[in-house]
Regions:
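HotDog/MaoC-like acyl-thioester-processing domains
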Residues: 17, 21-26, 34-112
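Short, basic/aromatic beta-hairpin or loop at an interaction surface
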Residues: 1-8
Length: 113
């Protein structure tokens, strides 16, 4: 990460719990790509949490982007990393997104008076 001077920034994250996860319970966490912009700047990931029986205990849906750690500005992914994401596991509803999709929740800051 430091070598490339890029890092992830999370825009939003939704966590849905289906069953209790105990502190000492062994779980498996999956990764699926739910969306990706053409140049890889923006992404949506889906993580599913499973117990040893394969029961889906929780799901995390998150969206974000990649920033240049020096300029602190959004940046596209290098081609070799972009290709890895493009060939990774995808959700059945995978889609290509743009910067407009990152604002779909229509949330605005509310400053203190």
């Amino acid at each position: 990460r430091d070598r490339l001077s890029i890092g992830p920034v999370v825009f939003n994250e939704h966590l849905f719990y289906f069953k209790e996860i105990l502190p000492d319970e062994k779980i498996r966490v999956s990764f699926e790509l739910a969306a990706l912009s053409k140049d890889g700047t923006f992404f949506e990931f889906e993580h599913n949490y499973y117990n040893e029986k394969g029961e889906n205990l929780a799901r995390c849906e998150m969206s974000g982007g990649w920033i240049n750690l020096k300029s602190r500005k959004l940046t596209s992914l290098p081609n070799d990393i972009l290709k890895k994401f493009q060939t990774s596991n995808k959700t059945s509803s995978f889609k290509e997104i743009s910067s407009k999709d990152t604002r779909r929740w229509n949330r605005e800051p509310r400053d203190l008076d």
